Amino acid sequence: MLVLASNLIDFPILSIHVGGEITRTARAIVDPEDLSIIAFELVGGIVSDPEIGNFLMVEDIREYGDDGFIVDSADVFVEAQDVIRLNKILKLNFNLRGLKVVTKTKKKIGKVVDYTVDSNTFSVYQLVVQRPLMQSFVDPQLTINRSQITEIDDYSVTIDHDKEEIKLTDSSKDEEFVPNFVNPFRKPNYAGQEEESSVSDNSSKTSE
């Protein structure tokens, strides 16, 4: 399932231990080597405590759904210096959004304004590209598959050729996360099925 990365910003983080939201995402940290999200920087809530780490590694996400990312507790949050790979990428100050997109012949295609992420692997799947002004009247936005990317640097993304450009469809914008783990806010009943726990019921009532 694909989801727009922009939909993962200001996304709730829910704790099993607390039974509700404890903080939110501030930005995604993308590794330019393999174009995957490795962590989310967090802001607000419990991470305002200086003793609580302010980054969530994607491997510590138990589940993700419409309500937010579910984690065991704030104990999984880390500081940048605690994880060598994370610290290294943060020092690169890499930001996929805003990069120019050009072909091998240096023809300008546009700039990255968003990207879609595979909800199972957190790998960047497609770039959402805003076209230059004169071309935007025909194709305001395009999506480019990661397989067409040949090079990335601090300023631009180079793609194989512009023959591979595809118009962004409305269905791409509307795709949402769906859980791919058993919801820890549910518990099995005696029939071996799942039923909502009181925590889940309370969360649903609050959202209403």
Task: Identify the role of each PLM range.
Residues M1-E208:
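Peripheral interaction segments used for macromolecular assembly
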